[in-house]
C-alpha cells in the first residue's frame, strides 16, 4: 500500500482540527430577556439598585451556554447613582469567590472559531458589571457567582469617598417553591395556645418542652432539639440565607429524612441544607415554629 506524503498528512490534520472549531457564538440583547422584568429594587440615600437572577434556561437562551451546569449563576444588577460622588461596588460582597467575566469566557472557548471566541470574550467583558458608577449615571451588568438552589440571597456593598452602604437581596427564582411556603404559619396555633414570656421565662418553658421530635405516630422518639431561634420570620430567613443555608424545595428528595420527624403533629416547617467545607456531605437544619413568643418575636425549635 503506497504511503501518503507527510505534507498531505499535515494538510489533512489541519483540516480536521479546523473543522472541529465550527461553533458560532451570538448572544441575545439583555434587554430582550424576560428576567429583567423580575427585578427586586432597593434604594438608600440616592443609590438605587435593581437585582434579578436569570434561570438556567434563560441563560442558555441568552448566551447558548449552560453556565448553571458548571455551577455558575449570573446575578444581574442595575445601579443608579443619584449622588454627587462616584459610587464603587464591591463585587466580592456579592460572592467572595465570584468568577470574572473573562474567566467565564475562557472556560467556554473550546470548539469555537477564532472570531467566535473573540465575540464571546467581548460580550462577557462588556456585559459585566462595572465597579465604578459616575455621579448622575446608571450602569448595569452581570456578576458571576456560585450557584445555589432556591432563593438567591446576597449582599451588595457600595462605597463613596465619605460613606458606605449595605444592601441585602433575596431574589426568588421561578419554578422553585421552598417547603416553608406550604405552611400557614398564622393558623398553626390558636390564640389561647400562644405563650408570651421574657428570656428567663423562655428558659423555664424550654425546660418543660419535649426534648425531641417524634415519629408520625407520636410514639418513637427522634432527634433532640438542640438549637433555638428567637426572631421574626423575615429576620430568621435573612440570617440563614446570609449564612449560606440553602432552602429545600417542597416535596423534594433532599427533605425526605427531615419529613420523618414531627413536632406538634407536623413535619418541619422548613428544612435547610449546607455543604460541609470539604464537600463530603450536607448538614441539615430542621425548624419548627413553637407556640412561644418573646415580646413580638416567635421562638423556633430546631435540629442541626
Residue ranges and their predicted role:
Residues 73, 80, 251-304:
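A cross-kingdom signal targeting lumenal/periplasmic-facing segments of multi-pass membrane
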Residues 21-28, 126-193:
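Surface-exposed edge beta-strand/loop patches
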Residues 85-93, 154-156, 237-242:
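Short, hydrophobic/aromatic beta-strand segments
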Residues 59-76, 82-86, 132-134, 217-218:
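Short, solvent-exposed beta-strand/turn "edge" segments of beta-rich domains on protein surfaces
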Residues 209-239:
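Terminal, regulation- and interaction-focused segments at domain boundaries
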Residues 82-134:
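The feature marks short-to-medium sequence segments in extracytoplasmic or secretory-pathway proteins
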Residues 28-69, 186, 206:
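Low-complexity, acidic Ser/Thr/Pro/Gly-rich terminal tails and inter-domain linkers that flank the onset
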Residues 17-19:
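C-terminal motif of bacterial Sec signal peptides marking the signal peptidase cleavage site
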